[in-house]
Amino acid sequence: MAFSSLLRSAASYTVAAPRPDFFSSPASDHSKVLSSLGFSRNLKPSRFSSGISSSLQNGNARSVQPIKATATEVPSAVRRSSSSGKTKVGINGFGRIGRLVLRIATSRDDIEVVAVNDPFIDAKYMAYMLKYDSTHGNFKGSINVIDDSTLEINGKKVNVVSKRDPSEIPWADLGADYVVESSGVFTTLSKAASHLKGGAKKVIISAPSADAPMFVVGVNEHTYQPNMDIVSNASCTTNCLAPLAKVVHEEFGILEGLMTTVHATTATQKTVDGPSMKDWRGGRGASQNIIPSSTGAAKAVGKVLPELNGKLTGMAFRVPTSNVSVVDLTCRLEKGASYEDVKAAIKHASEGPLKGILGYTDEDVVSNDFVGDSRSSIFDANAGIGLSKSFVKLVSWYDNEWGYSNRVLDLIEHMALVAASH
């Protein structure tokens, strides 16, 4: 069972175990959650509503059990707090992320995908691509092609549209209030705004954007404002790095850092050597090479954590694996700490304030062990090292497809709940 991101996004705050009366009023409860704006350097909450803070006074913050922040679990005492029904979503672009967003949405009780637009894929091929997936396995539900413009997924109809120009997609007529822009094409405010012409209320870009407000669930989604009609869910790598950097910076301070992501192959790469005028190395065969590449993921952390702006940068290695990537963050700390101290802080956050967003493992894992992991970032305690009290290398895994797609839906529902409280 899934639950609203008002609850899921509480991963960015240390919140006491939910009481039945805490969620009695959507508007007032939402303002309570928004009133807590992060942690102090020791990972304790910096601001809380009086009701929550009083529950913390009787014990150390490390013993507090927070609201879970996964897309698949819900505390029994928590009720859905949106205004009415499910949040209706449309998807533009039925690639890797578009398909997984639809897959995951079918297992949630807070979101319903009502339409998919892709000018290059007809309804029959959409059904085939949704049913079979070489990485994540076969779709467990039912898929039927009703006609050229309708799919039936788990007994619910999904409209199929084939428009090249997003301004021509009748989102309002299709019942979609929120649109996932996952084509990889319309990633700026001006381009993504075309969806608003068709009646969409909000657009979520499933990629970094040059000018749209950027959010990472568990890090800065609490800064979202209801007048923001177009937002970016950042990149999968930023979603992995930002929660890790948040914890380390708030506990020890990050003076500067370099990030490397060892990234699985993506659809933009070539199966064999081919032309790539902007990135010559990027045109080399994906299955034959480890390919150095640029990435703005580390710099983008400065957009979601302004206190780290200008302190992080990084690069990528594209490697011949189909899924799951790993971030290597090497950084200088402001406050002296052993590697064991850093591990302890991350473990605490993974079990408390960032549970379901940031994970922790001390087992001897490899990349394939994280296929289908819904968390944004899973810290590998055995893979990192410390050189001194102020210089550490931190390693964190992420399913760059599945985890990211979960966060897209989490961000949508958070936006819907903000709208419901205003």
UniProtKB/Swiss-Prot annotation:
Q: Which InterPro entries match?
A: GlycerAld/Erythrose_P_DH, GlycerAld_3-P_DH_AS, GlycerAld_3-P_DH_cat, GlycerAld_3-P_DH_NAD(P)-bd, Glyceraldehyde-3-P_DH_1, NAD(P)-bd_dom_sf
Q: Where is the composition biased (Polar residues)?
A: 50-63
GO BP of this protein: anther wall tapetum development; carbohydrate metabolic process; glucose metabolic process; glycolytic process; intracellular amino acid homeostasis; pollen development; primary root development
What tissue expression does the UniProt record report for this protein? Expressed in shoot and root vasculature, leaf veins and vascular tissue of flowers and siliques.
Q: Phenotype when inactivated?
A: No visible phenotype under normal growth conditions. Gapcp1 and gapcp2 double mutants have severe dwarf phenotypes with arrested root development and male sterility. Pollen grains show shrunken and collapsed forms and cannot germinate.
| Annotated site location: Activates thiol group during catalysis | H263
Q: What induces it?
A: Repressed by darkness, but not by sucrose.
What are the catalytic residues? C236 (nucleophile)
Q: Where does NAD(+) bind?
A: R96, I97, D118, R164, N400
The answer to whether keyword Repeat applies is: no
Q: Which PROSITE patterns match?
A: GAPDH
- Subcellular location(s) of the protein: Plastid, Chloroplast stroma
Q: Report the family membership.
A: Belongs to the glyceraldehyde-3-phosphate dehydrogenase family.
Q: How does it assemble?
A: Homotetramer.
Q: What else is known?
A: Plants contain three types of GAPDH: NAD-dependent cytosolic forms which participate in glycolysis, NAD-dependent chloroplastic forms which participate in plastidic glycolysis and NADP-dependent chloroplastic forms which participate in the photosynthetic reductive pentose phosphate pathway (Calvin-Benson cycle). All the forms are encoded by distinct genes.
Task: Supply the name of the protein.
Answer: Glyceraldehyde-3-phosphate dehydrogenase GAPCP1, chloroplastic
Name of the encoding gene: GAPCP1
